[in-house]
Amino acid sequence: MGRRKKMVERVTALMSNPVMIRNIAIIAHIDHGKTTLSDNLLAGAGMISKDLAGRQLFMDSDEEEQERGITIDSANVSMVHEFEDEEYLINLIDTPGHVDFGGDVTRAMRAVDGAVVVIDAVEGTMPQTETVLRQALKEHVRPVLFINKVDRLINELQVDAQEMQIRLGKLIDHVNKLIKGMNEERYNQGWRVDAAEGTVAFGSALYNWAISVPMMQKTGVSFGEVFDYCRAEDMKSLGEKCPLHEAVNDMVIRFLPSPIDAQEDRVGVIWHGDLEAGIGKQMAVADATGDLAFMVTDISMDPHAGEVSTGRLFSGSLSRGMEVYVSGAAKPNRIQQVGVFMGPERLEVDKIPAGNIAAVTGLRDAIVGSTVTTLDGMSPFESIRHASEPVVTVAVEAKHMKDLPKLVEVLRQVAKEDPTLKITLDEETGEHLMAGMGELHLEVIAHRIERDKGVEISTTPPIVVYRETITGTAGPVEGKSPNRHNRFYVVVEPLEPEVRELIREGEISMRMPELERREKLIAAGLDKDEAKRIADIFESNAYFDMTKGIQHLNETMELVLEGFVEVMKAGPLSKEPCMGVKVKLMDAKLHEDAVHRGPAQVIPASRQAIQAAMLMADDTLFEPYQKVFIQTPQEQMGGATKEIQGRRGIIIDMTSEGDTTIIESKAPVSELFGFAGDIRSATEGRAMWSTEFVGFEPLPTNMITEVVSGIRERKGLKKDLPQAQDFMSM
């Protein structure tokens, strides 16, 4: 314990000097070696035994992670590294690589300033590598590259020294091509990765060695010698001469920014307040004496302390007993404990200053994405946008009736811990529905509810979440209130694709300054008048108030928009969420007495006008698609392609490398249930595969009636497809 205590003392001493801090994440495709790399960095810092590093998987502290051999949650740790006779504090987050847990990566990107991108030298860049790199660049997080498993290239693929350099060069070029394509401005500012400069390291996380150009200069070990050591399988000597933690941490400290350098650039990307005054200025310089600005990026449950909110502290300092405001909460919260993480352990400290990643208890109203501040009325941070959407749903029931109240509380907790999970109560059937990123995601959550929360549950087989949208235009359609005194006239049409995409990416929101929003909408192809009159955005749908001078509309607008949101959450065709719908209010007639235009009158009138108009505008269903990447020996290629084509899938591209074929394809999520077992059988267990969410595509016309009827029946609605008249009968 003495060693750990000493480490805590060193960590706390360095916390208050942001120049000496690096907040970083390790990101990669699944099984490319992130957690093994993290272990060796910790061993180098003296936090775990060197003999166990790479096998202990210290960061995978969850029982399920160890069983499945994958990282499911992001794990945080603070450690100290000495570079050029100075001590630095590295706050490290190890993230999951499986596509179903990509939400953890997105949230981690908000907390860090730099990322070590890990790529398997044999497999090269894979779909999830591209996804995590895109998320990093979107949040203005600077990447450096670690090419792992170089020993496999030499010993398994038997490449010679020259071919190895060519292959590694190609891999680096490909990463740079991705960086340039995703953020050219940053690429031109020197964010490209370059072996000669030192922003690329090569090595083996399993055998604990790594080399980079600065490391070669420091140790005198040449690339040729590395090759010879690997051929002789003398990894031990290589690990002693070129320890992995030294090469990687030196690269992190030399090239990734400190909070002072990073925040000046990043604050404008993640916060839309005034950067020239008050808290904006304080965040830009990570001012520990300024007002508190803390963003929650993760929530976990501690059996003793309750909810632990982890996040990035941009300005001010956190200490016990502070009273703080949480965005969206009515009353202030009081901070109970502040601490830092050492893998699975949370260690209490007295105070944490700006520029650090902190773990706090007492924020009962916080959710992931909350802004926590001492400044009442501070404009909140931009919400965290996830690359994927929940597309698979299961119904959850408690096995024993006595557990029902506990299940309701447990579901509230898991939704708070994992914001990519959507929990809803189906009013018709009384079932709790749990929507997640994929089969594995929901399996893990269900297992945790039973294991950690102690509630036995049963779940239905997974079903797909569709999207309702319109392909035509309709209106003006009249919606009447039950008392006949209020009428709304709406037009619906498809929302411009570019506008929809910008909303989905978080580039356009109702939170941003009006002028900036208007300019972006016009640039995306919206009519000037419409851009000026946008009244609400919900998911990827928008509402426009095109009326002029209607009395009492201002005070009624909130209720009108409530009707809009209700329909966008559950469309008229099958009560599935809507996407890409533009609703325009063209005219309204309102009763002059407020008593006659209350919620019970206005909401149904607003809602029914939109529902009827959507059914007139060719309301249809879109289904979620995933890209499927398969690596298989050539002789198994036929089995793999047949497996995709038999699931309404399309082969997009096929490339060969040696005797391996890489198939890029896409298929509907509804057809991919059970794919893992089937592809294993079809290729005799020799295929490696991964998926990536690519969005929604139209459901084939010949399937619409059957699918809609099935959804309606499942939800306890009339099986027959609804007609516009059903909503206009009032």
Curated annotation (Swiss-Prot):
Which segments does the entry list as coiled coil? Answer: none
Write down which residues bear the modification named Diphthamide: H596
Q: Which UniProt keywords apply?
A: Cytoplasm, Elongation factor, GTP-binding, Nucleotide-binding, Protein biosynthesis
Gene Ontology cellular component terms for the protein in this record: cytosol; ribonucleoprotein complex
Q: What is its main location?
A: cytoplasm
Superkingdom: Archaea
Residue ranges of every copy of the tr-type G domain listed in the record:
19-260
Q: Which GO terms describe its molecular function?
A: GTP binding; GTPase activity; translation elongation factor activity
Where in or outside the cell it occurs: the entry states: Cytoplasm
Q: Which PROSITE patterns match?
A: G_TR_1, G_TR_2
Q: Binding positions for GTP? A: 28-35, 94-98, 148-151
Q: Sorted alphabetically, which SUPFAM superfamilies does this protein's record hold?
A: EF-G C-terminal domain-like (SSF54980), P-loop containing nucleoside triphosphate hydrolases (SSF52540), Ribosomal protein S5 domain 2-like (SSF54211), Translation proteins (SSF50447)
Q: Does the keyword GTP-binding apply?
A: yes
Do the record's keywords include GTP-binding?
Answer: yes
Protein's job? Catalyzes the GTP-dependent ribosomal translocation step during translation elongation. During this step, the ribosome changes from the pre-translocational (PRE) to the post-translocational (POST) state as the newly formed A-site-bound peptidyl-tRNA and P-site-bound deacylated tRNA move to the P and E sites, respectively. Catalyzes the coordinated movement of the two tRNA molecules, the mRNA and conformational changes in the ribosome.
Q: Give the protein family.
A: Belongs to the TRAFAC class translation factor GTPase superfamily. Classic translation factor GTPase family. EF-G/EF-2 subfamily.
Protein name per Swiss-Prot or TrEMBL: Elongation factor 2
Origin species, per record, is Methanococcoides methylutens
Q: What is the lineage of its organism?
A: Archaea, Methanobacteriati, Methanobacteriota, Stenosarchaea group, Methanomicrobia
